């Protein structure tokens, strides 16, 4: 299965704790790249700030967490091991707004 934009996948890096990440890169580019743009999640230090988007059980997650748009990075696609959930259009709109704040592109 190939990751697609809006999907949350488990990112398993060697010698590090596995954690969910949101695929942010447009789906058309994912297949041809080895690294794809993702947003990590956190359950620690969750704050209500403009660059965090909260996701929870209603979004298909096991526990509440925050997508941290300030920490967006390029992940190796082969380290995304299984899909957890797919975020809806409304939640992805929140992600896009938070990304605009994180990058000062608003």
Model-derived segments and spans:
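C-terminal terminal-subdomain/extension
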Residues: 1, 57-106
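Short linear motifs in intrinsically disordered
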Residues: 1-2, 44
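Compact nucleic-acid interaction/catalytic patches
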Residues: 17-57
């Amino acid at each position: 299965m190939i990751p697609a934009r809006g999907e949350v996948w488990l990112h398993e890096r060697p010698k590090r704790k596995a954690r969910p990440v949101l695929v942010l890169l447009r789906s058309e580019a994912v297949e041809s790249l080895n690294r794809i743009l993702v947003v990590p999640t956190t359950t620690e230090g969750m704050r209500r700030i403009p660059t965090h988007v909260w996701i929870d059980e209603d979004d298909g997650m096991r526990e509440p967490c925050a997508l941290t748009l300030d920490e967006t990075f390029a992940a190796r696609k082969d380290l995304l091991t299984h899909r957890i959930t797919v975020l809806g259009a409304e939640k992805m709109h929140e992600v896009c707004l938070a990304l605009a704040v994180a990058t000062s592109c608003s």
